[in-house]
């Protein structure tokens, strides 16, 4: 088995090294990751400039592009032999609830799924993560399960792991995505010439975080495993939209 590993924190991030070493115990691992931190890149694909990939001294390919670029390149042309699975992470910080929309970590896994491979996104749920080894151990267990019992073709796993030693993990929970309040306002500042600049504010606090959600699992010290899908269609709204269309004049 060949596993393509990527992330959005960059090829020198601690989480990707620990993950690659752990997965190397069960598979051949190839790392293709951004050359710098690309957190929040979401599913952006570089179309206006060429991509450059360089094999580093640590054996990792670093790409001047987004996490999605890395996985796309790794599957469709960079490697002599196509991988069997994509694992993205271990992310520095959680990807809970609405975070998945912005996450380059999740997008890297989703790109693997777009291109026909099973995929997992793994995040360590702490702003000051320490226990990357715990998250890597969880990923290795899930890789084995996923190969033995594949998910539906449009599905990936979004995995969040408490920042705890392995022995303190209380459980593994199948969860749904929770939701956050709206983001905090942008932070206004000034450049050295006094011109206004803005920093994107922090994510909102959890709002929908009750039992069954990814937020709740992490708060309990459990690993949260959320199956998420490529199809963004809101099926419950189709009939309502169809009703609108019946009332829209055709001329």
From Swiss-Prot:
Enzyme class: hydrolase
A GO molecular-function annotation: exopolyphosphatase activity
Cysteines joined through disulfide linkages: none
Annotated keywords: Cytoplasm, Hydrolase, Metal-binding, Nucleotide-binding
Compartment(s): Cytoplasm
Cofactor note (record): Binds 1 divalent metal cation per subunit.
Binding positions for a divalent metal cation per the UniProt entry: 8-9, 39, 91
Annotated InterPro entries: SurE, SurE-like_Pase/nucleotidase, SurE-like_sf
EC number: 3.1.3.5
Family per record: Belongs to the SurE nucleotidase family.
Role, per record: Nucleotidase that shows phosphatase activity on nucleoside 5'-monophosphates.
Protein name (record): 5'-nucleotidase SurE
Species annotation: Nitrosococcus oceani (strain ATCC 19707 / BCRC 17464 / JCM 30415 / NCIMB 11848 / C-107)
Taxonomic path: Bacteria, Pseudomonadati, Pseudomonadota, Gammaproteobacteria, Chromatiales
């Amino acid at each position: 088995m060949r596993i393509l590993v990527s992330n959005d924190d960059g090829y020198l991030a601690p989480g990707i090294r620990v993950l690659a070493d752990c997965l190397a115990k069960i598979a051949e691992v190839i790392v293709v990751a951004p050359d710098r931190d690309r957190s929040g890149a979401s599913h952006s694909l570089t179309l206006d400039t060429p991509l450059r990939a360089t094999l580093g001294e640590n054996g990792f390919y670093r790409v001047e592009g987004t996490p999605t670029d890395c996985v796309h390149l790794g599957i469709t042309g960079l490697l002599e032999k196509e991988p069997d699975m994509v694992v993205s992470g271990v992310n520095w910080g959680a990807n809970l609830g609405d975070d998945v929309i912005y996450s380059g970590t999740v997008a890297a896994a989703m790109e693997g799924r777009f291109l026909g491979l099973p995929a997992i996104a793994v995040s360590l749920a702490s702003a000051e993560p320490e226990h990357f080894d715990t998250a890597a151990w969880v990923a290795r267990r899930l890789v084995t399960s996923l190969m033995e019992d594949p998910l539906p073709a449009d599905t990936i796993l979004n995995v969040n792991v408490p920042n705890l030693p392995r022995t303190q993990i209380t459980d593994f929970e199948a969860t749904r995505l929770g939701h956050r309040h709206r983001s905090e306002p942008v932070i206004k500042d000034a450049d050295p010439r006094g011109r206004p600049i803005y920093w994107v504010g922090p994510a909102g606090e959890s709002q929908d975080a009750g039992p069954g959600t990814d937020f709740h699992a992490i708060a309990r010290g459990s690993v949260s495993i959320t199956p998420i899908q490529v199809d963004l269609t809101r099926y419950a709204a189709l009939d309502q939209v169809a009703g609108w269309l019946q009332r829209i004049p055709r001329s």
